[in-house]
Structures are given as C-alpha cells and as structure tokens.
A protein has these predicted regions:
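Bacterial N-terminal signal peptides that target proteins for export
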Residues: 8, 13-25
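Hydrolase active-site cap/lid region
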Residues: 285-334
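Cap/lid segment of the alpha/beta-hydrolase catalytic domain
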Residues: 149-263, 303-313
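Alpha/beta-hydrolase fold nucleophile elbow
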Residues: 266-278
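Bacterial N-terminal signal peptides
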Residues: 22-35
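Glycine-rich nucleophile elbow surrounding the catalytic serine of serine-hydrolase chemistry
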Residues: 276-286
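Alpha/beta-hydrolase-fold serine-hydrolase catalytic core, especially in secreted/extracellular enzymes
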Residues: 39-132, 137-142, 156-159, 168, ...
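Loop/turn elements at helix/coil->beta-strand transitions in domains of secreted/extracellular proteins
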Residues: 142-147, 211-215, 268-271, 292-296, ...
C-alpha cells in the first residue's frame, strides 16, 4: 500500500544516544497518496536466496548496511514492505481516496447505555465498491478509542438470510497472473451466516462499551470470499492489475474502514485499534503493519502467517501452521511464490517479526491460548524477541510489545478481550491496571532464535 502521508510525532528518546528527539514515523494524513520513498529493490528468485536458519535481522538492510539512523530506518521500512509483498502478500492498489458512509439504520441498545448504527460505505471506481459496518458507541459524548473488529459473523443489522453457503466450484488452477495455481480444489465458504440482531451483538460487546471503547465490526468476507474464487467478487474485479492474495485484500478492506472512521466525531483517531482472531488475527497483523493510522494492533490466536514465526511452526518445529501447511491449505491467501519455500523454509528472507517491527513504535500485543495447537508459544516468543530491537532503537519502552496467555485452546475469550483492553488502557489512555504483558509459558519456549532442524 502506498504511503498516505507523513506526520511528525515527538517521543522521548534516550538522552545518551545521538538520535534526534523528533521521531518521524509514517502515519496517516488526509492528503492524497504520496509516492514511496524509495524504489522497490530488485529481489532474487527463491532458488537464489541464501539459507538463513536464524530470524532475519530487521536492522540490517538488503545490501548489508546496519541501520544506525532514522533516515536509514525509513528506507529499511520500505525495503521490508517490498520483501513482504514480493514473497508473501502480493501488491495492493493505492487507497481510493473517496470513501463515504451512509447510515442505513440506527437504534439505542443496552437499555440506552449504547448506540448502534449500520453504515454502508462506498468507495473505489465511481464509488461502486461497498462495505456494511456496524458501529457501536457508548452513550454520551465522544470521541472514544475505537476498536475495528473483523468478524466471522454477519454484520449486525444486515438483513441477509441465506444461511450457510454451498462450497464453491473448482476453479481453473492455471489462471495466468493470479495466485490460483496454488489451489487445486474448492474450499467451502466460512459463513456463520444468519442475521445478527444489533441488541444481541451489543450484549456481546457490553464489556468493551462499558469501558469506554467504541466498536466497529463487520463480516470479513465482504472484503473477499474465503476461498480460491475470491478474485471473482468484492473489490478484485475493479483492480485486475494487482497480484494480491486475499489476506492482503482483507487488510486493504480494513484500511478502507479506517478511512471512514477517522472522519467521524465518535472516534478518537489517535486511538484506533485493530483486533481480530485466527485468520482475522493474520489480517490484523498485516493491516497494522501497513497502515500507520492504526494506533495499536492486537492479533489474537493468529498462528502461522500471523504472530507465529514460520521458522518455529510446522512439522518438527511445533504447531500446525508452518509455511508448508499454510500454502497447501490456504494458498489463495498469498502470492504463489510463498509456496516455493516448501521444504526450504530457512530461505525465507523475512518472518513474522517483520510485521511487528513495521508497527514500531506503536503498541502491539499478541493475545494467545496456552493450549492453542495451531501455534505453540515458542513461535510467538521468537517473533516478539526478534522485533524488540526496533523499539529499543526508536527509544521507546519495550513494554510497547506485549503478549498475554490465557488457558484455552483456539478461541477468543472474555479473558482475552480484557487483556487486550487492559493493554490498550495502559498504552493509549494512561490507565495502568498493574498487569505485565511479557509472560510466556516457560516450559514451552526458548531464547534460541535458530529454527530447529
């Protein structure tokens, strides 16, 4: 995604260093998209990449130069984005710059303690693309810190009653210019598809609302069906010249919601949070890394292609979602090039910590379950440890990178939500609940950052 603009933010910097007190970070502006700061580097084919069992260093540029100043770090950020797009995500179109919203319906909920609006967004070529989002706000005056929460369920308030969708047909696996070749069979759509009553949805968010957070939620497949046929619907026919996998498309869609939310009086645009679970945690990782308007990223149970480092996921390494498993089952999430790392994962020139490093100096937390078999704690720990040098370089507290484990399997629980809210309170609102967000299940982790054989 091209840069939207620049903003200067003054942050405290360690006085013993030679760095300036003005830390320039990429952030939002309502101006038109600017060109990228540097041309994309020429990147080698997978077969020509070196074997690298250790986590690739975020502070070393492609030419081997060590990052020692902010100008170099900005260039390094662009390199990292280019690498992630080339080998994993694909390339997305620029922001359309024309997002608008129309209220479809509204009502009070929770006995007057909160308000609900169903909003239809329009954008893209001739504003022919759209999304329906549900906005829940606490009663009273805003602006409120706002959580954007992609959901597996239908957008609350939408009148849609076709229930579970049938499996999609097998698609042509040799379609040129797409990532369809990574998929050889149809996958059923994930569709928890009955309408969701706004009052019922508000009850599920009552804790968040009572703590002073607004919630924007929406059905994620509006941003691309979760199957190999995703290119035939949603945004993709409007942008035929892009090779993005659906994971990047989902993240791009979340950023269109940010386009709208940051213009609304209910939202404190300096306190926008993205939180999603499982594959929606993966999209949270991508969106937070590539959209600097998101003040805090909170992927939950995101597993492989999320918080879990590829080098520590998969057969013989722990968890289920290594690069082999992800590209075999979910190849349409990515560009086909990622599948070329099957059997040679140590050639990956990146890993999950790059998404966290791109988030710096903004706060980020991974919310996990101790018994989530999709991703073992060590894969998460390696990601967190490998990203922290960027936060140290930028002179901000290491507690801006957090992790929290609750006792459960692959799920998003009320305890997970409370951990994320406590972390957001601490990082964005100056409310310290006395919690530590740096604890891992000790017996399941290691400080060794080299992938096991």
């Amino acid at each position: 995604m091209p840069l939207r603009g620049l903003r200067f933010i003054i942050l405290p910097i360690h006085m013993k260093t030679h760095r300036a007190i003005a830390l320039i970070i990429l952030a939002s502006a309502t101006v038109a998209a600017l060109p990228v700061l540097a041309a994309s580097p020429t990147l080698p084919e997978v077969k020509d990449l070196p074997v690298r069992p250790e986590m690739p260093d975020v502070m070393t540029m492609l030419d081997g130069t060590r990052v020692t100043n902010l100008t170099q770090w900005q260039a390094r950020r662009e390199e990292m984005k280019a690498v992630l797009e080339h080998y994993e995500l694909g390339h997305a179109p620029p922001p359309p710059g024309n997002v608008s919203g129309t209220d479809v319906r509204s009502q009070t909920v929770l006995d007057g303690a909160a308000n609900f609006r169903l909003v239809h967004l329009k954008f893209g070529p001739e504003q022919k693309l759209g999304l329906d989002i549900a906005v829940f706000t606490p009663a009273g005056a805003g602006p409120f810190p706002t959580i954007i929460n992609p959901s597996f369920f239908m957008t609350p308030g939408v009148n849609f009653t076709n229930g579970m969708a049938a499996p999609t047909p097998v698609m042509n696996t040799n379609t040129p210019g797409t990532n369809a070749s990574a998929n050889v069979s149809a996958r059923p759509r994930l569709n928890f598809g009955m309408p969701v009553d706004p009052e019922r949805a508000a009850r599920s968010f009552s804790n968040q609302l009572s703590r002073g957070y607004a919630i924007v939620t929406y059905r994620y497949t509006q941003c691309g069906e979760d199957n190999p046929n995703f290119r035939t619907n949603s945004f993709y026919p409007a942008y035929p010249g892009y090779d993005w996998g659906v994971l990047y498309g989902w993240a791009w869609g979340l950023s269109r919601i940010v386009d709208y939310v940051e213009t609304q009086p209910f939202a404190d645009k300096s306190k926008l949070i993205a939180l999603g679970h499982s594959r929606l945690g993966k999209l949270t990782m991508v969106a937070t890394a590539f959209d600097d308007r998101i003040a805090l990223g909170a992927p939950a149970g995101s597993s492989g292609a999320g918080t879990g480092a590829y080098r520590f996921c998969g057969p013989g390494r722990g968890g289920k979602e290594g690069v082999e498993d992800m590209t075999r089952k979910f190849g349409y999430y990515f560009v086909p090039r990622l599948a070329e790392f099957t059997g040679q994962m140590e050639k990956l020139p990146f890993d999950a910590h790059w998404f966290v490093a791109l988030t710096a100096p903004r706060p980020w937390i991974s919310v996990e379950g101790t018994d989530d078999q999709n991703c073992v704690p060590n894969a998460v720990k390696q990601t967190v440890l490998a990203a922290k040098p960027v936060y140290a370089f930028l002179g901000v507290s290491p507690d801006r990178v957090g992790v929290n484990y609750e006792t459960h399997r692959h799920a998003l629980t009320p305890e997970d939500w409370n951990a994320a809210l406590d972390f957001a309170d601490q990082q964005l609102r100056g409310k310290d609940h006395g919690r530590k967000f740096d604890q891992f299940p000790a017996e399941q982790t290691s400080t060794n950052n080299v992938a096991p054989k």
